[in-house]
């Protein structure tokens, strides 16, 4: 039995609220159980130096946690003077995932930055940031289209992400912190709306896992991601 009595293939309660920031071109607050992540998308009419003059855009992300997003207060990374390796890895994952569904050449020479700030953490913050970040990104692109700054929609599809893993020998969908921290295997899966895999991050913490067990986790992830995508479409009015 899972700690909070969910079925093995049952997601936590999911809620996505759009347009929660009056300044950002796109924004979303995603709540997955007790995990809450605020995602904002900002448009800038410039690109990184390595893309200048190539008539190509860029999508990137930054990720952070509020000091009391976790059980005990953590010092702000700005106060430490440097980002932790975990933070850098997560924000690269978010940016890389979102770029997979954007035609950067159709975006023009501009950047969209997703800022993903964890308000409250109870497992699955990076996957929630990807799923919520997609909403913010889609709305920012919608603004560009409405303003006539884009000739064609650069969004090539939909994507979402979820965590899966083995906890006490059982394959589980959407791990909360108490499961994630004790899982024998932990995976983060990103997929698009064609059912294709964008990213698999998987680690065996307590024991190695077989190909058959990995397939079982992928099946769970596909189920969860389809549910998240249905909510994304509902929120976006698609």
UniProtKB/Swiss-Prot annotation:
Binding of phosphate, residues: 86, 124-126
EC number from the UniProt entry: 2.7.7.56
Catalytic activity, reaction form: tRNA(n+1) + phosphate = tRNA(n) + a ribonucleoside 5'-diphosphate
GO molecular function: 3'-5'-RNA exonuclease activity; tRNA binding; tRNA nucleotidyltransferase activity
UniProt xrefs under SUPFAM superfamilies: Ribonuclease PH domain 2-like (SSF55666), Ribosomal protein S5 domain 2-like (SSF54211)
Keyword annotations of the record: Nucleotidyltransferase, RNA-binding, rRNA processing, Transferase, tRNA processing, tRNA-binding
Signal peptide residues on this chain, from the entry's feature table: none
Pfam name, any one: RNase_PH_C
GO biological process: rRNA catabolic process; rRNA processing; tRNA processing
EC top class named in words: transferase
Entry similarity comment: Belongs to the RNase PH family.
Subunit description: Homohexameric ring arranged as a trimer of dimers.
Described purpose of this protein according to its UniProt entry: Phosphorolytic 3'-5' exoribonuclease that plays an important role in tRNA 3'-end maturation. Removes nucleotide residues following the 3'-CCA terminus of tRNAs; can also add nucleotides to the ends of RNA molecules by using nucleoside diphosphates as substrates, but this may not be physiologically important. Probably plays a role in initiation of 16S rRNA degradation (leading to ribosome degradation) during starvation.
Protein known as: Ribonuclease PH
Organism: Dichelobacter nodosus (strain VCS1703A)
Source organism phylogeny: Bacteria, Pseudomonadati, Pseudomonadota, Gammaproteobacteria, Cardiobacteriales
């Amino acid at each position: 039995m899972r700690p909070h009595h969910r079925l093995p293939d049952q997601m936590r309660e999911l809620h996505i609220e759009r347009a929660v920031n009056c300044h950002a071109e796109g924004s979303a607050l995603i709540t997955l159980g007790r995990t809450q992540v605020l995602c904002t998308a900002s448009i800038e009419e410039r690109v990184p130096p390595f893309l200048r003059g190539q008539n190509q855009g860029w999508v990137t992300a930054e990720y952070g946690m509020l000091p009391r997003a976790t059980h005990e207060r953590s010092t702000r990374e700005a106060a430490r003077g440097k980002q932790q390796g975990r933070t850098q890895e997560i924000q690269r994952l978010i940016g890389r995932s979102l770029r997979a569904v954007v035609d950067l050449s159709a975006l023009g020479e501009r950047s969209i930055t997703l800022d993903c700030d964890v308000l409250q953490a109870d497992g699955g913050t990076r996957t929630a940031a990807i799923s919520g970040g997609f909403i913010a990104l889609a709305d920012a692109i919608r603004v560009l289209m409405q303003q006539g700054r884009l000739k064609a929609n650069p969004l090539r599809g939909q994507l979402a992400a979820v965590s899966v893993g083995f906890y006490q020998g059982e394959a589980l969908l959407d791990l909360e912190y108490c499961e994630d921290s004790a899982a024998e295997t932990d995976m983060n899966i990103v997929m698009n709306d064609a059912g294709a895999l964008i990213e698999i991050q998987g680690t065996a913490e307590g024991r190695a896992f077989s190909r058959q067990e990995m397939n079982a986790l992928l099946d769970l992830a596909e189920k969860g991601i389809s549910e998240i995508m249905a909510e994304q479409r509902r929120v976006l009015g698609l």
